[in-house]
Amino acid sequence: MQQSGNTVLITGGGSGIGAALAARFVDLGNHVIIAGRRQAALDAVVADHPGLSAMTLDIDDPAAVNDFAARLIAEHPGLNVVIHNAGVMRIEDVATRHDLADAEATIATNLLGPIRLTNALVDHLKQQPNAALVTVTSRLGFVPLVDAAVYSATKAAMHSLTVSWRAALAGAVEVIELIPPAVQTGLTPGQATRPGYMPLTDFIDEVMALFAEQPTPREIAVARVRPLRTAEADGRFDVTLTALNDMARAARAASH
């Protein structure tokens, strides 16, 4: 992926990984547009990094996604990189009957949102030089967190979708999968300071070094995520599943 001179859209750019990526890509000489639901959060990121632009987007609303895509192309016709970063994660007990509002919202944001936005932008991207599509998935797409089963399932689906997009768009749009480990962000309550999670700055440092490799790897997988990424292929899936879920429950209990 070209490192500078791009026009980059980052969804979920008002905080966490999205905001941190936006700052780094601006520093490399790209024009970056961050998008998200919360105008105040977007404004705060732009205030810290004046080279950014911001646009509100309700990724869950199909009509809003189509309207956003039309406005985005009209205002930023050079758009050639899209980073699907917006995501939500909810803890749930799938072993008992429960309200599915959180599950449905997770699917809408994490899976349907990227599908709709890519559909709205794909014809434009195919016409751009050095076009790239980046999906932010998760280590949990390869070994699920049982207490976040729907989140894990959406990330597994996004991995599969990324593989399909890469094959379908070969020669026209570079498709890259970014696979975070557990990172200190506001994704879940207490996560931003949870011991044992990867500090955000360290994660972004490693990610940007991988993006800079030529050719850019098809999968941006930092060292911490690789044991989960390869667990099934290496015959370690069952033991990794148990260890991951035991550690996650202990970490959440310690933070309460």
Question: Model-predicted segments: where are they?
Answer:
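Residue(s) in the substrate-gating loop at a strand-loop-helix junction
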Residues: 138
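Conserved mid-core segment of classical short-chain dehydrogenase/reductases
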Residues: 66, 89-104, 147-150
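SDR active-site lid
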Residues: 160, 164-224, 234
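Conserved glycine-rich Rossmann-like NAD(P)H-binding loop of the short-chain dehydrogenase/reductase
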Residues: 28-44
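The beta1-alpha1 cofactor-binding region of Rossmann-like NAD(H)/NADP(H)-dependent oxidoreductases
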Residues: 56-68, 100
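Conserved glycine-rich cofactor-binding loop
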Residues: 12-16
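Active-site helix of classical SDR
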Residues: 118, 154
